[in-house]
Regions:
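Interdomain helical connector at the RecA1-RecA2 junction of SF1/SF2 helicase-like NTPases
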Residues: 1-82
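Class I S-adenosyl-L-methionine
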Residues: 29, 96-103
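Helix N-cap/beta->alpha junction signal
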Residues: 66, 91-92
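Pre-Walker A (Motif I) flank of P-loop NTPase domains
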Residues: 81-84, 133-134
Length: 186
């Protein structure tokens, strides 16, 4: 509907998966078996059951912190050339790690999150909007309330299951601007 109403640009949505390490795969399988056993014991997926909830939470956290996620994201950034990227990570630690790696690879990037004071956040945002930076890395600080029409690429390195959050994040780069023909969302 939004594309037909001409409020967003044409875009390509690329689904990519960072494979887990063998150790992570094994842990994932163990968590899954434990979840299945617990669900069978309590007679189903009762999300009010604290042990079941914790097993599911810990499995999801392990996936979110997979060792290959950041290197894979860097590889995708290098492979898919765009004028400017917004990279949304799972947490501040991942944002810092991703930013450090891509700066070493020659990208002009900065972090935008609540660890920075307001002046530094504003400076990083303005530098991105002006084109002085070509990558802005954040976790949840850019989820809602920010328009970033300058960006023509978005990389979502977090594994949110919230449809609303995914739509909000994609919307950061889909706004129409005079110089943008299309956008890429990874």
């Amino acid at each position: 509907d939004a594309r037909e109403d001409e409020v967003i640009v044409n875009f390509k949505l690329l689904y990519a998966y960072a494979a887990m390490t063998e150790d992570e795969e094994e842990k994932y399988k163990k968590f899954t078996k434990s979840i299945q056993r617990r669900a069978a014991t309590i007679g189903g997926n009762n999300m009010n059951d604290y042990p079941l909830k914790m097993l599911i939470f810990n499995r999801a956290r392990m996936v979110k912190n997979s060792k290959n996620r950041i290197p894979f994201g860097v590889e995708l950034l290098q492979k898919h050339k765009r004028d400017s990227w917004i990279v949304l990570t799972e947490n501040k630690k991942q944002a810092k790690e991703f930013n450090k790696i891509i700066n070493k690879k020659g990208y002009k990037s900065a972090i935008y999150n609540t660890d920075l004071d307001n002046a530094e956040r504003e400076e990083n945002l303005n530098n991105f909007k002006s084109g002085s930076l070509n990558v802005l890395v954040s976790c949840t600080a850019l989820d809602e309330g920010f328009d970033m029409p300058e960006a023509d690429g978005a990389m979502i390195l977090s594994a949110s299951s919230s449809k609303r959050q995914r739509i909000q994040r994609m919307g950061r780069v889909l706004r129409i601007t005079a110089n943008k023909e299309n956008a890429l969302i990874v």
